[in-house]
C-alpha cells in the first residue's frame, strides 16, 4: 500500500458516510475514527411513468440496500485500509470532532475491492466530487446524529468489543475517553430533568399543604361572600356549617355540572362576571361557603345578588390534579358551546381562503363550533401606580448581548423596592412558575369562527343583557363626561397653537430680527410688524389610512398582508389616494428617465402619498425614519412644479422654490440631484457658507428657478440690498427639520415672516405658498406651521412619533419577569368598554403564558403564534374584524411576525409585553393604533394608551428607549441613566473588538449630533486607543499630505518632529518596503492567497499591476453560501485609506513585512468648526486647500501638536511651507487654518477640552496623547456593468471589430443614436473635470481616449505596461488600444448605468478553419467585405444567434451567429459564402443551423426610397413572390410598452429594459439597408486590406483563390485607400458647419454640390479624402469655406430651415465624423440642443412615416 494508507478495523457502520473504525497502530491503546467514503452521493430508483423501467435520481438518503451491500462486502474480509482525502470538523461523535472522508480498500479472498467503486457499480451511488463538496457545504450530507442515535452507536461499539478478545479495561477506558463530552452532556441533561421534576413536586406539595390549611380555617369561618368595600361582619357559631370531605366531593360534582347549563345561563354567567358590582371575586382563602343551600343556589344560577348587594361568586373546589392542570396549562381554556335540547344538526363544512379563490380546489374542513367554558379566577386588586413615559425613537444598529446582567438584577431590585405594588404575589408567582416549567408542553390553539358572532347576537337578544346594556349606557355617559373634563384639561396644558402664541408675533419677531442684526454684518432694512392670520380647522373625521383595497378581484385578506400602513391626516378632510406605480405619477418624461437611471423603479411607502399631494399643490409634512426616501419623496415633485411655473412666467428672475437644508453637505447633494432632474433648462443655484457674495449676487440677478441653501444663508440673502425676490415663490421646503428645529428655528420663522409679508402684497391672493417639510421626528416646532400652512397634509411613517404627535398616554415599567403577567392583568382590568387591545410578545411561550392568564381571568382572547399557517391567520383575521360586543373588548396576543401579516390598525390599547431584537420592529408595533390616533387638526381627545414592560433581559434596548422617554416626559428615574450608561459603555467595548473606529464627528467637533443613528464608537478606551510610541505627542510636526478626506482631516506621512529644539526625523521606509514587497511578489510562487479573511487580519492586496501594498481587514460586508467572507473592507496601512476588496484578491503577507513602520497617520485640524453652526465642511473648502497643494508639489505641511488619540494627531496650527535650500530657510506660503477661518470656519475652543475630558475618564494622560483609529470615507463602489445582448430573432448590427471568425464583436444599430448622445456627455464631462485618474487596477472601468478619433469613451483596463501606459478594451467598440495614463479619466456611476456596454462578442456558427487557426487572408477578406459598403459607410448587417455561451472578453455572452448581408439582390449568409469561397470548411456539428436559416430566409423588397428632406423611410411593400414567412411570423407580437414576464435563463432583468424595438422597426430597418440593384459581390483578390481599426494595412502573400462559381466583377473605389480626417460638424436651423481637422494644411481641394461635399488633400505625405452625401439639400451659392490654420471651416446654407438628424444620408456611423460638442449650448430662442436631443430619441425607434406604432404616441408625449 502507498504511504498515505493505514490499516483499520471496522467496528460499526450505518451508511457509506458513517463508518466507525479502530486504527490498528498500537496494541496497547485503542484509537477510534469516524470515516466516510469521499466523493460519492446516494441515488434512488423510482418508477418512470413515461418510459418502462426504473429512473435513477440523486437523493439525500441512502437506500436500505446500501447497508445490505456493505454487510456483504465486510463479511469474511482479510484487511481494510483507508486513505484520507478530506477532513470535516462538524459532525463526529468523538471528542476530537474529526470526520475523515477518503477511500476504503477491502482485501477479500486475495482481491482488492474499493468500496466507492462497488457502490457505484451496484447502482446505489454516483461519483461526483464537486457536487459532494457542494452538498457538504450546504449541510445536505446527513452525518449529524441525534442523542439517541449517538447513544446507540456507542452501545454497538461496546457490544463489538465485548465479543472481542481485547481487555475490557482497555476498551472501556478508550471508549469513555473518546466520548467524554457526549456523556457529560447526557449527565447534565439528566440532572436538569431531575431538578425540574423535583421542583414540580415541591411546588405541588406546597400548594396542597396550603390548600389543606385553608380548608381547616374554613371550619371556623363565619364569613359571607364579600365585595370590594364591604366590611367583614362576624357571625354566630351556631350559623356556621362545617364542611367535610364528603361535602367537598358533592360540591365538586355540582361544579362539574355547571357547564351543562343552557345558553341563557351562560349569558347570565357572562354578564354577572363583568357587571356585578365592582367585579368582586374571592381569593382561594375564601373559596367556600358555610352551608349546602348556598352551594345549590350557586349550582343553579351560578351567581346571585345577596340582599346586601354583594355578589356571591362560584368558588373553584379543585383537587390536587385539577389545580395542577390549571396552573400547568394542560387543560385548554376556551369557549365551548353549551349542550342544547334541540336535535343535533349536521356539521357544516367550510373552506379557508381568500374570497376570490376556487373552492373546488381546496379541501373542505368541518366548521368548528363555538365552545365557551366559563372559568372563574381570583381577582387581584392592585393599586395602580405607573409613570407616564414614552418609548421608541430609532433602530439599533448594533446587536450585542449584555453579559453583566447580574449588575442589572440589583438595579431591578432597587426599582421594585421603590415601586411597590400591593398585589397578591402568591397566585401570580405560582402561575408564572408553573407556566415557565411547562413552557415546552404543547397547547391547543384557539378556534374562533363565525359561531362566535352568532352567539353574540343571541346574547344581545336576551333580556338579561338588555338590562345590562342600560347600565352600560349610564356608565358610558359618565365616562364621556369624565373624558370631556380630562380633554378640556389636557387641551389647556397642551401646546396647541393659538393666536396668542403666534409664530410670528411682534415681540418674538423683534427679538429674532435684533439677533440677526447683531450676528449678520450686511445692512438690513426695517421691516413692518405683522401677524399671520389664524387658520380655522374643520372639525371633521379625517382619513387615517389611505391604503384601501380598490381592486375587486383581489382578496381583502391578501390586501391586508401586502398593503403598507401609513398615517395621513388632512386639514380639508379630502381623500388621499396613494399611487403605487411610478409610471402613474405625472412627472414628465425627462424626470422619469432620470429616476430610472437612478435605479428608482417603485415609490417607497412614503412616496406613494407625498408625490401626489405635492403635485396637487398641498402643503405636505413628511415624518419618516432615516433612509426611508424623504428627500426623494419631495424633490422630483418639486422639480416638476418648478418647471411648470417657469413655463408660465419665463421672464421672472426670482426663485420659484426655495429648499432649506441643515448642512452644506445636504445642500450639495440636493443640488446634484436637482440638476439631474431639471437638466439644463432650469437654473439651479446652491448657496452655503464660504461662497463669494459677488458671485452669489450675480447668479441671483441672472435668474434662479430653484434655490437651495442653508438657514443662515437664506437669512443673509433676504437681508441684502439685492435680496432674493420672493414675488414668484410658490414652494418653500424645509429638509432635515429634526436638526433645524433645534438649531435654526429662528431662521425658519424669519423666512416664514418674510413670506407672509410678500403674500400680503401679492396681487393674486389665491396663489399661496406651498410648504413642504421633511423630518425624522415630530417636533413641537412643526405644530404651529402645520396648522397655519394652506391645505396641510401630515404623512407619518415613523409610527413611534405618533405618540408625540397625538400626545398619547404612555407608561413604562421596569420590573421582574415573574411580575409581568400581574402587571398586564392590572392594565386590562382598567380597560372599560368594547375597546380593542393588542399584546405583542417576542416568543411563542410568552404568547401561551399571556393567553392562558387572560383566559383564566375570563377575557375574550385571540392568540396568534409563529406556528399558525395561512388558514389560521385568515380565520383569526375574519373573527377579529367581525367581533362586536358592546360590553367586552377583544384582546389580541401575538408575535411581531404575525402582527405584520395581520396588519391590525384598529386597536385602542397597546401592551409591549417584551421588546424585540430590533428597535425598528418595536416602532412598527405602534401602527396598531393607526385608525384611532387623533388628528392635530381637531381638538379631540381619545382614550388611547400604550404600556411598555421592561425587565433585565431587555436592557440592551434601554438607551434608545430612555432617549425617547426624555423627549416625552421629565419624570424619568435617574437610576435608568446609570443603567443606560453601562449598556452604552459595554456596546462600545464590543465595537472595539470589531475594529469600529471612533466617530468622525466626535473627533472633528467634539460632539456627535446624531448619536442614536451613528454606528461608530463614541467612547475612548485606554487599552485600544493609546497611541504608538513613535506618534508625536507634542512639539512641532512636519508631514506630507497623501489624501484629503475633508477640509480638516488628512492622511499624512510624517517627516519630522521637533520638541524643545530637538528634531527627530522619521526614516522614509515606505520606498524600501515597497521595493521588498515588489521583489517578493514578483515570484509567482509567492503569490499565495490569504485564505479566509477575519477582522483584524493583516495581508497584502494588489493596488496596481504587480504593485502590492499592506492592508488590514476591518469589516466583512458579505458572505458566500458556505459562510465564508466574500467582500470585505480593508484599511490600507501605508495610506490610511479604506477600500473594498474580495477575499480572492488578498494575498498572504510574511511576518517580516507586517511589523515594518511607514509612519503614516491621520492629521486633524483642531479647535475650528464650520460656519453657521454647520456640522460638515463644504466641498468648496476642501477643493480650495487641494488646489494649493497641487500647484506646488514641493510644499510640505507643518503644525503644532495639541494632542494625539490613537493614530490621529490633532494640530492647532497648520501651515504650508516651502524649503529654500539655497538660503537654508523655510518660508510659509499658506496658513491653512487662517484660510478656513477667513471664509469657511469659526473657532471652536471647546473641541480639544471635550476630547481631553473623555481621555481622562478612560485613564489616559491628557497631555500625553490619546488613541483612536479614524476611518476615512471609503472609496465609492461603482455599480455592476450591464452588457448588451442579441434578441431571439434577427438583430440589426454593425460590425465593430474582428479578431477572426471565432471572435468578433458587433453592436446594435438601435442604440447608435443613444451612443452618440452618451459620447457627447462623456466628452463634456471630461472637459469640465480635468483631474486625471489617480491610480488604476486591472479590471477597472474608466474613461479613455480612443486613439482613432481622440474622443473619450468607456473602457476597461486589461493590462498595465507601466505607470505611463496601459492596454484598454473599449467596451462599446469591442477593440483593444494602448492608451497613455494621462488620457484616462474616472467614470461616474451614471455613465455606467445610462446605457449597457455595446460590444457583443460573437462567432460565426457552422464553419471552422482548415487548419488549427484562421489564416490572415480569410480574416482580412471577412473584415474588408463586412465592415463598410462601397461608399465607406458601415454596413447594416443582420445576425441570428443559435448558441449562447460564456464570453471570453466581455461580461455578457458569446453568441454563435449566422451573419446575413442584405446589400445584394438576394440576402447572403456570410457563413455559407466563406464555405463556398473555400475560405472555411463546414463544422459538421453546427452546419444544420445554416440550413435552417436557408429554409426560413425571407426575401425583402429591392426598392427602398429615401425621403430627401425628412431622412426617414417610406412605406415598405412586400414583393409578390419569394416570400416564405410573413413578417408577423418572424417576430412575435409584443404588447404596448411590454416588459418580459419571465427573465431569460442567461440574461439579467436589467438588460431587458433596452429591448425597445418592435417588428415594425425591424421591417423598416430591412428596407433602409437595401442596397441598389447594381451592387454585386466583389471578387476575392490579394490586394491590400485593412487589418485593424488603426487603419494599418498589410499585404497578404497568399495566392488568389480559385472561384467555385461565376463571381461578379469588383467595383473599384479609390476612396477606400484614402485616409479620413476627423470632421466636427454643427448646425442650427439655417446653416451647417464642418470643421475638417487637419492642422497646418496649406493646399486642399473642396467641392460643394447640392447634396454632397467632396474633399481631397495631401499633407505630410498622407493622402486625405472623402465624399459625403448630405442629409439635406444646401444652397451652393451661399456656401463657403476657409482655411483657419488648425482646421478647414466649411459653412453651408440649408434650403429648408430645419434641423438634420445626421450629417449624412446614411447617418453618422463613421467614427471620424462627430458632432461639435462646443456648440451645443444654443440661444434660448432656438433651443437647438433640446430639439436635437428629442430627434435623437425619436431616431432610436427608426419607425417609418406610415407606422401606427404605439411608440409614436410615446414620442408625442416626449415632444
From Swiss-Prot:
Question: Which spans does this entry mark as compositional bias, Low complexity?
Answer: 480-495
Start and end residues of each stretch annotated as Disordered: 480-506
Q: Which residues bind ATP?
A: 624-631
One biological process term from GO is: regulatory ncRNA-mediated gene silencing
SUPFAM superfamilies xrefs: HSP20-like chaperones (SSF49764), P-loop containing nucleoside triphosphate hydrolases (SSF52540), Tudor/PWWP/MBT (SSF63748)
Q: How does it sit in the membrane?
A: Peripheral membrane protein
What GO terms fall under cellular component here?
chromosome; cytosol; nuclear membrane; P granule; PET complex
Name assigned to this protein: Putative ATP-dependent RNA helicase TDRD12
Q: Where in the cell is it found?
A: Chromosome; Cytoplasm, Cytosol; Nucleus membrane
What are the residue boundaries of the Helicase C-terminal domain, all occurrences included? Answer: 823-980
GO molecular-function annotation terms? ATP binding; ATP hydrolysis activity; nucleic acid binding; RNA helicase activity
Boundaries of each CS domain copy? 1618-1704
Q: Which organism is it from?
A: Bombyx mori
Enumerate the UniProt keywords alphabetically.
ATP-binding, Chromosome, Cytoplasm, Developmental protein, Differentiation, Helicase, Hydrolase, Meiosis, Membrane, Nucleotide-binding, Nucleus, Repeat, RNA-mediated gene silencing, Spermatogenesis
Q: Which SMART domains match?
A: DEXDc, TUDOR
